[in-house]
Regions:
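A composition-driven surface/loop motif
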Residues: 69-150
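Residue-level detection of beta-strand-connecting loop/turn positions
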Residues: 29, 53-54, 146
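Sec-dependent N-terminal signal peptides
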Residues: 4-15
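Short, isolated positions in well-ordered beta-strands
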Residues: 32-34, 57, 86
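Structured surface patches comprising rigid loops and adjacent beta-strands/short helices at the edges
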Residues: 35-44, 58-70
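Boundary at the C-terminal end of the N-terminal hydrophobic targeting segment
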Residues: 18-25
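Short acidic, Gly/Pro-enriched loop/turn segments at secondary-structure junctions
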Residues: 47-52, 69-73
Length: 150
């Protein structure tokens, strides 16, 4: 019985270690996704900001932080339109290079000139009053995945 219990505990512990964990930081309609193996040290400053992978978040702006098993693909931004709203998911490795604002289904992304690699933006969903605006001087890829904007 003790061997079975020990084996069960070991299997559960290993399955937890082998599954990917992602720290999600939600600010308004934007979710920044940081893979646990990349997040490193997260520093808090004066109880008002947190630094994660060189992205600074004002804690007063953060709606929630949670951990899940979502897979994060580096250099990816996903924009999903749903009627009069849009949500944006940002890979943690490019979060510090982007300034994002979302108002309803209107998405505006400014890409820093400091970004070293191409970022892929994937747009999907539908909206009768949606917009996507992106600015920046570095090369980017725009994927339209069943997108309907009118």
């Amino acid at each position: 019985m003790k061997k079975i219990f020990a084996l069960t505990i070991t299997i559960l512990a290993l399955s937890g270690l082998l599954s990917a964990q992602t720290l999600n930081v939600q600010v308004g309609q934007v979710t920044y996704q940081f893979p646990a193996e990349q997040a490193g040290v997260m520093t808090y400053a004066a109880g008002s900001t947190v630094h994660i992978m060189d992205k600074v978040f004002a804690l007063s702006d953060v709606n929630m932080m949670y951990v899940d098993g979502a897979e994060v693909v580096d250099n990816r931004v996903a924009v999903v339109y749903n009627g009069e709203t849009a949500s944006v998911s940002v890979a943690g490795n490019v979060a510090k290079y982007l300034t994002i604002s979302v108002t309803g289904a209107h998405v505006n992304i400014a890409q820093s000139d400091d970004v070293a690699e191409e970022i892929t933006y994937t747009l999907s969903g539908n909206s009768t009053d949606g917009e996507f605006y992106m600015s920046g001087s570095y090369k980017a890829t725009l994927e339209l995945n069943g997108l309907t904007l009118t």
